[in-house]
Design a protein with these regions (language model features):
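Cysteine-rich, disulfide-bonded extracellular modules and peptides in secreted proteins
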Residues: 1-95
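Conserved functional hotspot residues at active sites or interaction interfaces
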Residues: 4, 49-50, 87-137, 142-333, ...
Length: 538
């Protein structure tokens, strides 16, 4: 009682018949003024504070009675007014090192090609750029380089756009195979290969970027997407070869083998592969890969056994694509070293979830998996694991005569330090406590319910949605197949997102994770008015 505070008014805690309560002493906002803490006065502005009026800076004097105009920020130079200061936002992005940045590298990753009419590798690859800035246009440039590795770079502009505030732009880009296939051909190369096939995406203001492979659901049977991470967010140790990534991957379930229990079709064998794809962003970048999967030889890379090492020097636009040649091959736990920023993707041309050791256990069907990996420095200790929207329920609501079943989600957690990690979840039984012994050690978790995961040491966390059969949707109905997501730790959640739901899909879902007290709005509507919110245990 007697304590003072500032809101839009000067308020004092007073004793009332109902107990202690805040009461208004003076309504500053009604006078067009603000409350000054400690002085408990209504003033025009907070003494010695700065703010923005559009792109003009305003400075409050020492008394709070007047404001003066400062400089006008030059948006043509990538400068915008933030907190009363003219700020070079791309330079600020280098300090903040988040997933919002000014330089990205995108790659048309290897996808499934299993015959006429089933060639996902040839379908529309796209990059989507969203502008999260509230007040400035983002000028975006996308480039490719048609020279070959080892030659001097000669970037070519392939697309430009001015993206309005809080908007996005879809860039439909041409195919650029990374598996050594000649232009116009798909899956005819050496699989493991060195190409100059990356796209560079730059902006004069920080943006968010995604890639879709392919984009639209038009005769699509194998697709996924990646959240791209900017160069500003990557691990950097110029001139010093340092561990940059511990790989989170997934077993490659479709491959021709000599084992009839795992060979999908002996008369017409289908070889699909897991991949680890490394993109150079700076000249003369040394890269070393300690692989946990056998690598098929191709280009400058010899056949490399599990536990072997691959080393190469990359330049801008160079793509070192490493691929497997075996059933259940899996790059998980591999370590990528680099002495300058490199972008790393992991995935599969197409694979199933759950994975299996015998075809009799398969839960159809497979799908393309891909994700740009997060660098080691972003590993965290506290995560929220969520379950995809129940597809059998949605298909039943759309009129199909099927029952609704509990839909599992598959998760993988991996240790990134030599000390390993001790994992605790809010699940019961054997999944409540997990022990990871050393760098690259991982554990798989299956769950039909949301849960919290905490670790005593930094880890990376991934989810893979279930194949259609595993989700209880019969083939022939629109049930969907696996997709992979790198789950960020709670400490890295953002306050706003601008995103795309691609066209021509039967169902679109958005999963929102937020603290219980958060106010969440989707396109102007409170989320609580659109969908039911579920509390996650823990």
């Amino acid at each position: 009682v007697g304590e003072m505070r500032c809101t839009t008014a000067i308020e004092r805690c007073e004793q009332t018949n109902d107990g202690a309560a805040w009461t208004t002493v003076t309504d500053c906002a009604a006078q067009g003024l603000v409350c000054v803490p400690d002085k408990w006065e209504c003033k025009l502005c907070l003494p010695d504070s700065r703010r923005c009026d559009g792109q003009t800076t305003l400075l409050c004097d020492g008394t709070g009675d007047s404001e003066s105009q400062g400089e006008t920020c030059d948006v043509s130079q990538g400068v915008a007014c933030r907190a009363g200061q003219c700020t070079q936002l791309c330079s600020k992005a280098k300090v903040q090192r988040s997933n919002v940045g000014c330089e990205y590298w995108a790659v048309d990753l290897d996808n499934a090609n299993v015959g006429a009419g089933l060639n996902a590798a040839a379908q529309q690859y796209s990059v989507v750029v969203s502008n999260p800035q509230p007040d400035v246009f983002a000028e975006v440039l996308i480039e490719r380089d048609d020279t070959v590795p080892g030659q001097a770079n000669a970037p070519l502009s392939v697309a430009t756009a001015k993206i309005p505030p809080l908007s996005l732009r879809v860039f439909q880009l041409g195919p650029r195979e990374v598996d050594g296939s000649p232009p116009g051909e798909f899956d005819t190369g050496t699989h493991t290969a060195l190409t100059r096939a990356a796209y560079r995406v730059t902006s004069n203001f920080p943006v968010v970027a995604y890639q879709f492979n392919p984009l639209f659901n038009a005769a699509v049977f194998s697709n996924d997407a990646s959240l791209l991470k900017p160069v500003e967010a990557l691990s950097v140790a110029p001139g010093q070869l340092a561990r940059s990534y511990v790989v989170l991957g997934w077993p490659q379930t479709i491959a021709s083998t000599d084992d009839p229990n795992t060979n999908f079709n002996p008369s017409d064998p289908i070889d699909l592969r897991a991949f680890l794809t490394i993109v150079g962003t700076r000249a003369n970048t040394k890269v070393k890969v300690e692989t946990r999967a056998g690598i098929i030889g191709g280009g400058p890379v010899p056949t490399t056994a599990k536990g072997g090492v691959v080393e190469h020097v990359l330049g801008p636009f160079d793509v070192l694509n490493l691929e497997t040649d075996d059933f259940n091959a899996d790059f998980t736990g591999s370590v990528v070293w680099a002495d300058q920023p490199v972008v790393v993707f992991a995935g599969n041309e197409a694979s199933d979830a759950p994975f299996f050791d015998n075809l009799s256990k398969r839960r159809c069907c497979a799908d393309h998996l891909e994700e740009q990996l997060d660098p080691i420095r972003t590993a965290g200790t506290r995560f929220v694991a969520t379950i995809s929207a129940n597809r059998s329920e949605m298909v039943a609501k759309a009129g199909a005569s099927i029952g609704v079943v509990a839909q599992p989600e598959y998760f993988r957690v991996i240790a990134v330090t030599e000390a390993g990690a001790q994992i605790t979840t809010t699940l019961g039984g054997a999944q409540a406590q997990l022990s990871l012994k050393g760098r690259g050690a991982y554990a798989d978790i299956a769950s039909t319910q949301e849960f919290m995961l905490e670790s005593n040491a930094p880890v990376m966390f991934q989810s893979v949605s279930a194949s259609q059969d595993d989700g209880g949707v019969p083939r022939g109905l629109p049930g969907g197949d696996p997709s992979s997501i790198i789950i960020p730790p709670v400490q890295q959640f953002r306050k706003s997102y601008v995103f795309l739901t691609p066209d021509k899909y039967n169902f679109d879902f958005v999963r929102v994770v937020a603290p219980p007290a958060a106010s969440v709005v989707l396109d102007g509507k409170p989320v609580q008015e659109i969908a039911a919110c579920t509390a996650v245990p823990g």
